[in-house]
Structures are given as C-alpha cells and as structure tokens.
C-alpha cells in the first residue's frame, strides 16, 4: 500500500476565502454579496458600514480579504490602513473605487492596499482579485 501522507502535504487544501465587505451603502454591500455568491468559493464573514467596525472585525476575526469602500477612508484613515496592513500582513485589502483614476490607484498602493477595484466594474474585476487571494490562502493551508 502506498503512503499518500507526504503527497497530500504538498497539495494545497482549498478552503473558501473569508471576506469582509465594508461599504457605507447597505444596498451596495448586498450587491457585492450577490456577486460573491455567484463567484463561489468564498464566504462573507461579515459586513461593516464604518471604519471602526472594519478595524474591530479584522482584528477579532480571521479575514482573508477586506473589500473596503474608498469613501470610508479619509487621508488619516489611509494611514490607519497602512498600520492595519503592518499588523495583519496576511490580510489582503481590495479598495473599492467610486472614481477609478490612476491617482487613486497609486494612493491605494502607497498605503498598502493590495488591489483596486472600480465599483462600476466589480463583476468584471472581482474574480481576478479572488483568484489571487485564493492562491495565497491555498499556499498558507498547504
């Protein structure tokens, strides 16, 4: 009989990506939930409508991906995003942009946001973000 234990340790186990949806607009949070449900292999672990709720949930829960509305983030809050990324290096952050400009994307990168997603392009752009995060999660689990 062949011992498969060594082989199985090399294969990454797949588990759903745990997502926190943070947007001031409840209707848009529901839209994101529907998109994520269609995409599959992820679970919405929580929702937040304020930055205080975001910080509370990401520090108390095991979240893989934070979908964060840029309008919730002031210039001071961008510094908080950077600090959060330093405290929780495994957390991936996708900033949801109402106004998708190169300047916004550059600011997101500068403050340690991993992805920028245009709100009006969420259905087209979110699958690539989830695929990237799934690869990271699979690597951690393996």
What name fits each language-model region?
Residues 1-20, 24-28, 124-142:
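Non-catalytic signal-transmission and effector/linker regions of two-component phosphorelay proteins
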Residues 47-65:
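Acidic, metal-coordinating helix/loop segments flanking the phosphotransfer/catalytic sites
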Residues 26-46:
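Two-component/phosphorelay signaling modules centered on CheY-like receiver
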Residues 79, 99-117, 121:
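Alpha4 helix (beta4-alpha4-beta5 surface) of REC/receiver domains from two-component response regulators
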Residues 59-61, 84-91, 111:
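Conserved phosphotransfer cores of two-component systems
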Residues 66, 93, 116-117:
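Two-component signal transduction core modules
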Residues 67-84:
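Conserved phosphotransfer microenvironments
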